[in-house]
Amino acid sequence: MNIVSDVNYATSVAALRMLQASSVLDITEEDFDFLTGDKIWIATDRNRARRCVEACVYGTLDFVGYPRFPAPVEFIAAVIAYYVHPVNIQTACLVMEGAEFSENIINGVERPVNAAELFAYTLRIKAGFKETVIDAEENARQKLRANGLK
């Protein structure tokens, strides 16, 4: 695992925390059931699927009437991992492809991800990156020890 992967994962963890803390989704109960349900999305569901995922990504902005701005891959993948039923994760990645990693947005580099990359990244989030969490905890402990704390 490299530094970029660790930073991307940490960004996704922050996104998951934001999702858990937010109760603002600009989505109907019927659409929420569609998004989280185990019914497989078919081709004719594509627009609804995108609208539902976007409602979770941009819910707060939409609710208060602010304009949307491009969300990074880390946030979109976190939304997909958190809300979309596993049978529809690949489809959600397909309809949401084209986003950029936060680092690229910050650096002004245009490199949109395709569906396969978004899917792979979403799987990493679903898996929890156990080794990343363990490494992060160990790094935090080392910093505390270096500062004289146990």
From Swiss-Prot:
SUPFAM superfamilies assigned to the protein according to its UniProt record, in alphabetical order: Scaffolding protein gpD of bacteriophage procapsid
Pfam families: gpD (PF02925)
Transmembrane segments: none
S-S bridge residues: none
Gene Ontology CC: host cell cytoplasm
Family annotation (Gene3D superfamilies): Scaffold protein D (1.10.1850.10)
GO terms of biological process kind: viral procapsid maturation
UniProt keyword Mitochondrion present: no
Cellular compartment(s): Host cytoplasm
Alphabetic keyword roster: Host cytoplasm, Viral capsid assembly, Viral release from host cell
Superkingdom assignment: Viruses
Further remarks about this protein from its record: Phi KhT, a host-range mutant of phi K, can grow on E.coli C and B, besides K12, and is more thermosensitive than the parental phage phi K.
UniProt family annotation: Belongs to the microvirus D protein family.
Assembly description: Component of the procapsid particle composed of 60 copies of the internally located B, 240 copies of the external scaffolding protein D, 60 copies of each of the viral structural proteins F and G, and 12 copies of protein H.
Function: Assembles the procapsid by joining twelve 12S pre-assembly complex into a T=1 icosahedral particle, called 108S procapsid. Ten proteins D bind each 12S complex, which are formed by three pentamers of F, G, B protein and a H protein. The scaffolding protein is released from the provirion after genome packaging to form the mature virion.
Protein name: External scaffolding protein D
Taxonomic path: Viruses, Monodnaviria, Sangervirae, Phixviricota, Malgrandaviricetes
